[in-house]
A protein has these predicted regions:
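N-terminal auxiliary segments of SAM/dcSAM-dependent transferases
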Residues: 1-143
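Conserved alpha-helix/loop element of class I SAM-dependent methyltransferases that forms part
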Residues: 146-150, 164-180
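Conserved class I S-adenosyl-L-methionine
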Residues: 178-189
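Conserved SAM-binding loop of SAM-dependent methyltransferases across substrates and taxa
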Residues: 188-200
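Conserved SAM-binding motif I beta-strand of class I
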Residues: 203-208
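S-adenosyl-L-methionine
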Residues: 210-249, 261
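A conserved beta-strand element that flanks and buttresses the S-adenosyl-L-methionine
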Residues: 255
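C-terminal substrate-binding/active-site "lid" region of AdoMet-derived donor-dependent transferases
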Residues: 260-336
Length: 336
């Protein structure tokens, strides 16, 4: 009998609650993101705007749950810490929004344009927050007004957009960039622009394999950059560049953004982590790393559970917590 069984069972319970919550949130965002609208919000808050976050969280918990116990769990353990009313004006003051004009243009299968969030439409605005007990909090935001944002479409499908999620998830990485920077993945140049604006950044090398994306950027966006001379674009596969060219360059920092979400990000993340040793002087940073590590964490935990059930695991629970920590996983994936 595993001696720390109660602790393991509690962690497994939290994992299952995380999964239940995230399935419900995914269904909401994919199918009914405008479940709450201006009329509903006015009705439930009674005109008191200070109550909007609380009311949004409570309404969401009730709507996404199947019973009272679930509603209480969702509201108390997740949405109370998760839901945030965002300021549209604050995002409009973002340097990229203020200084870069995205024209409505179509080149081949690619198109530059705009999309909008409607008042009280829900969306993920930042990476997850992982609590000490490994409860994972999704960051759900909303605006009280229409908010438009630039978007790149491929064959009519959103490929990249400068939404609050991109801004917030990239913000801590932008702050850490200095010296000579390598950026894997171009998008529509948001990260490159924000880093390029920093006085402590000497150069920005962007690695992008899609020539159409590069052409769009060079024709319509790069000319609007103030310090264009700091930008170098390399058309290359990211992993080939990291393996063969990057070690020669001695970059100070690298930011990796090669995926759309966790579903296609885990394998790419692991591939790049294994190449870090080729450039030991470079500090690597990864987009939505917390969410990617969450996916890996629970796969590791499932393996530990199986070993416990078969009697092949006797390490204390403190070791389990260590194996599931971000710091441990960041190093562990290099050897998978």
């Amino acid at each position: 009998m595993y001696k720390d069984r109660k602790s393991i069972d509690l962690l497994n319970k939290i994992k299952e609650e995380n999964f239940l919550l995230f399935r419900s949130v995914a269904a909401y965002l994919n199918e009914f993101p405008c479940l709450i609208n201006k009329e509903i919000m006015e009705e439930i808050v009674g005109g008191v705007s200070e109550n909007e976050e609380f009311s949004f969280a409570l309404f969401l918990a009730t709507a996404l749950s199947e019973n009272d116990d679930e509603a209480k769990l969702f509201e108390r353990e997740y949405f109370k810490k998760s839901v945030k009313k965002l300021s549209a004006d604050e995002y409009r003051e973002n340097p990229y929004f203020k200084n870069i004009v995205i024209p409505r243009k179509k080149v081949s299968t690619w198109e530059l344009g705009y999309q909008s969030y409607q008042p009280y439409e829900g969306f993920i605005y930042d990476d997850i927050e992982v609590m000490e007990n490994y409860r994972e909090i999704p960051k759900i935001g909303f605006f009280s007004e229409v908010f438009s944002f630039p978007t790149v479409f491929e064959d009519g499908v959103e490929w990249m957009a400068i939404k609050p999620n991109e801004i917030e998830t990239m913000k801590p990485h932008v702050e850490k960039m200095s010296g000579d920077v390598c950026v894997f993945g171009l998008g529509i140049g948001y990260f490159a622009y924000m880093v390029n604006e920093k006085t402590d950044v000497n150069s920005v090398t962007i690695v992008e394999r899609d020539s159409s994306v590069i052409n769009l950027f060079e024709k319509y966006i790069l000319p609007q950059f103030k310090n264009k001379d700091k930008i170098t674009i390399v058309k290359s596969d990211a992993f080939e560049f990291a393996k063969k060219e990057m070690p020669k360059k001695r970059f100070d920092c690298a930011f990796v953004d090669l995926w759309h979400d966790v579903s296609d990000g885990v394998d790419l993340y692991i591939r790049m982590k294994k190449l870090e040793s080729n450039s030991p002087s470079t500090k690597f940073y990864y987009w939505i790393e917390k969410s990617i590590l969450s996916n890996i964490r629970w796969h590791i935990f499932e393996g530990i559970l199986k070993r416990i059930e078969s009697g092949n695991f006797s390490e204390p629970f403190e070791n389990v917590k260590k194996y599931l920590s971000d710091d441990y996983l960041k190093n562990f994936v290099k050897f998978i």
